[in-house]
Design a protein with these regions (language model features):
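ABC ATPase C-loop
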Residues: 147-149
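H-loop/switch region of ABC-family ATPase nucleotide-binding domains
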Residues: 190-191
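Conserved beta-strand-loop-alpha-helix hinge in the C-terminal portion
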Residues: 210-231
């Protein structure tokens, strides 16, 4: 479970989040929506200690992220909106293997995870390809594969479908749905509910620095009040 309590966060001199509280259950498929600049990305980067709050707290499975950032980064997989922020290797297979290698797994298990992750995003044939030779959409899929290979308890994806073609979107959607069914928390940050509306257990809208709306219906007409188009 991820628990956010009375969170306050700043970007420069601007307060982005103020008094935000949120609880995300194991296995929940949560969509975080809101206008550009509302603080969605600032919020999710608190989940594994990439950003520190000014006040309040974030805990992952009962451990305060500020006190155990390494544990949080192991438990919370993160896929950034710009996939280039994720890459640490020049070749697809080496990049996806980086996370599992740092978990101290044996080579057989690492190879299994890398193969399964690349298969899930339709990139199994590109294991030996240099990342800089891939299209933007292919790079996005490699970034998702890198997070999947960690087999985290909680997976955060910031605009994960940007640049993906329809077959890749279907493949990624199927994998995310399966992960949620298996007990992994899946948190998707998006401006387009149509991508995941049928998968979401709950939709949270961030506005005014806090949770302005929670709903389990993508057709909820109140979404439009916050610049989110109902489905």
């Amino acid at each position: 479970m991820i628990t956010v309590r009375d969170l306050r966060a700043e970007r420069g001199d601007t307060t982005v989040l103020e008094g935000l509280s949120l609880r995300i259950a194991d296995g929940e498929f949560l969509v975080i929506a809101g206008a550009n600049g509302s603080g969605k990305t600032t919020l999710v980067r608190q989940f594994n200690g990439l950003l520190d709050p000014e006040s309040g707290s974030v805990s992952v499975d009962g451990v305060d992220v500020a006190e155990g950032p390494v544990a949080a980064r192991t438990s919370v997989g993160m896929v950034f909106q710009n996939p280039r922020d994720c890459f640490v290797g020049a070749v697809v297979g080496a990049d996806v293997a980086f996370g599992p290698e740092n978990l101290g797994l044996d080579r057989e298990e690492i190879d299994r995870r890398v193969g399964a992750a690349l298969e899930a995003v339709g990139m199994a044939d590109h294991r030996g390809t240099r990342i800089d030779r891939l299209s933007g959409g292919q790079q996005a899929r490699v970034a998702i594969a890198g997070a999947l290979a960690m087999e985290p308890d909680h997976l955060v994806l910031d605009e994960p479908f940007t640049g993906l073609d329809h077959p890749a979107r279907r493949s990624v959607r199927r994998r995310l749905e399966a992960l949620s069914a298996e007990g992994t928390s899946v948190i998707v940050v998006t401006h387009d509910l149509r991508e995941v509306s049928d998968l979401a257990d709950r939709i949270v809208v961030i506005s005014g620095g806090t949770v302005a709306l929670e709903t389990d219906s993508p057709a909820d007409e109140r979404l439009a009040e916050f610049g989110v188009r109902p489905c």
